[in-house]
A protein has these predicted regions:
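Juxtamembrane helix-loop-helix connectors linking adjacent transmembrane helices
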Residues: 45, 49, 84-150, 160-161, ...
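Hydrophobic alpha-helical segments embedded in the membrane of multi-pass proteins
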Residues: 134-141, 174-179, 195-211
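Membrane-helix interface linkers and caps
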Residues: 2-15, 43-100, 123, 216
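Conserved small/polar residues in nucleotide/adenosyl-binding loops
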Residues: 243-244
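Hydrophobic alpha-helical transmembrane segments
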Residues: 23, 27, 59, 97-101, ...
């Protein structure tokens, strides 16, 4: 298998690669994400915004994920000392239209399958398919997109590349990178089903990264799943509804 231009090996392929650089990137991302989230929370509190409930709570939650974008960019550029483009795509990359097509197809497939399960399996009505959609949906969709991008940058662009660099094996790297992905999603802690669900999510997104040599299609599918999970009100069991942002 050629490593030249391979997204999985983007960290190890750097001329200045050293074993400690991926570790330093990971630590920097974690510390910076916590720091940025704290700053965001304090700023909102100083502005008199109550982030414990309502829309403020929702968007603060999105913001605490979105700050990972800045954390990754800073860590990769100034700690890892590598091009920030290396956390987005290998070479050759994905054609620009492919992620948009992937989002549309994934959203249709997910919506149809889960709606059929909800309506015919659990007695929901068709109106409940978008029962949670609100007036702020366009804004929330942007937040969902940025959150999906943030997670793919962090877990596929940093963690996956780090574990692959250390093990020199993409499969082992993918399996190891799934662990922190599960750990940051407390929704998974309630049952073994939740853990399996998030583990499968991580492997699916990693497979998309492998096939398309970059994170953009994974971001699109990630966004599609989270979008449906946000707007639906089908009353499905938690094991069916877990989503990843």
């Amino acid at each position: 298998m050629s490593r030249t231009g391979n997204f999985f090996f983007a960290s190890r392929n750097q001329p200045n690669y050293a074993w400690w650089r991926p570790l330093a990137e990971i630590l920097a991302v974690v510390v910076l994400a916590v720091l940025f989230t704290g700053v965001l929370g304090l700023t909102l509190e100083a502005a008199g915004v109550d982030t414990s409930s309502g829309a403020a709570d929702k968007y603060f939650g999105y913001g605490s994920v979105i700050v990972e974008i800045l954390a990754v960019l800073v860590a990769v550029r100034f700690i890892g000392r590598r091009p920030v483009s290396s956390v987005f795509t290998g070479q050759p990359g994905t054609k620009p239209w492919v992620p948009f097509a992937a989002f549309a197809v994934a959203l249709v497939v997910i919506s149809v399958v889960m709606s059929l399960v909800g309506v015919y399996g659990y007695g929901a009505s068709w109106g409940q398919v978008v029962g949670n959609i609100g007036a702020d949906f366009p804004v929330e969709l942007v937040a969902l997109a940025l959150a999906a991008l943030a997670e793919e940058m962090a877990f596929r662009g940093v963690f996956l590349q780090a574990f692959t660099a250390w093990t020199r094996n993409p499969v082992i790297g993918a399996l190891l990178a799934a662990v922190p992905f599960i750990l940051v999603h407390p929704q998974a802690y309630g049952s073994p089903v939740g853990i399996v669900h998030y583990f499968a999510d991580a492997l699916l997104f990693t497979l998309l990264v492998w096939v398309f040599n970059g994170i953009w299609v994974a971001v699109a599918v990630h966004l599609a799943w989270n979008t449906f999970g946000t707007v639906q009100d089908l009353g499905l069991p938690v094991s069916c509804l877990l989503y990843t942002s």
